[in-house]
Amino acid sequence: MTGIPFGHHQSLAQVLRSYSQLVKPKIIALLLMTTAGAMWMAGNTDPFKFGVTLLGGGMAAAAANVINMVYDADIDRMMERTRHRPLPSGRIRARHALRFAGILAVMSFGLLACFTNLLAASLAMAGILVYVGVYTHWLKRSSPQNIVIGGAAGAIPPLVGWAAATGELSWAAWVMFALIFLWTPPHFWALAILKREDYARAGVPMLPVVAGERPTAAQILLYALLLVPVSLLLVYPLHVLGSFYLSAATLLGSLLIWKAVQLLQEPHSRERATSLFTFANLYLLLLCGAMGLDRWSLTHTLWDQALASLQGVYASLGALANHLGAMGSLG
């Protein structure tokens, strides 16, 4: 179709599909959930500012993903998982992708600066720089700790959300940063275990390639054990969230640790690695959802009623047990 200035496409729909793959929409959705969680926690309920922040933050994340794909096109060609992506397959040219990334970055900064504040806009741009400069350019091909240090880029979206909502960064925002920072290694290393051969073929020194599955599983468990208490700091001592979030974070954290223990017991099991990777995504999604629900007054009303009902049932069972015990002693 000559009206479309991109090779290897037969229709506009195919062009749009390729550009959608270029920005990695699933990753963006997960990152934006952390932005939303931070804004819910901060108490911002302005729908317009909320929507603009998610749109601007999503554009910044998309720009970073596109630049990353341009830089990594050579190794993507070597990996089975990535060789069909738009750049290594030749469906999109690098210069078109970079132009697209530049437009996204400028639009992101403009939206956030005009409709939220300069701090949020600057943090979004910092996220691009850290992801591209620190992770993609510096660490990804040189250090097995690449995802640990470079993972700071993925922890910036909640800072953007908090800054957009309040115009500043409080301790709660930095706890959110730490939470995502500690969540990233278990999430990414579980995937790296599954794709170990791919990374080895491309010469990328991911931890499972350099150290093997068992040491990687041990590191995953360590980060999971650190993550859970950090997630509870939002309840105490910060008192930003309440009992509903506390229960959700404790349950989700316990399940994450259990999944990590299972992987450590069977570090070569693809099933265990897949289970951990899937649950790590679900963990973050549900945890951020719990942040939003905890800030909703109706949630606390229903939660308190549920706890009161459980206490009533427990008291009734206790009274019944005592009554049966008394009858038994009389008999």
From Swiss-Prot:
Q: In which compartments does the protein localize? A: Cell inner membrane
Q: Where are the transmembrane segments?
A: 22-42, 50-70, 100-120, 147-167, 174-194, 220-240, 241-261, 273-293, 307-327
**Entry's Gene Ontology molecular function annotations:** protoheme IX farnesyltransferase activity
Give the matching PROSITE patterns.
UBIA
Q: Which Gene3D superfamilies match?
A: UbiA prenyltransferase (1.10.357.140)
* Statement: the UniProt record of this protein carries the keyword Nucleotide-binding: no
Which membrane topology describes this protein?
Answer: Multi-pass membrane protein
Remaining remarks: Carbon 2 of the heme B porphyrin ring is defined according to the Fischer nomenclature.
Q: What is this protein called?
A: Protoheme IX farnesyltransferase
Q: Which organism is it from?
A: Synechococcus sp. (strain JA-3-3Ab)
Gene, per the UniProt record: ctaB
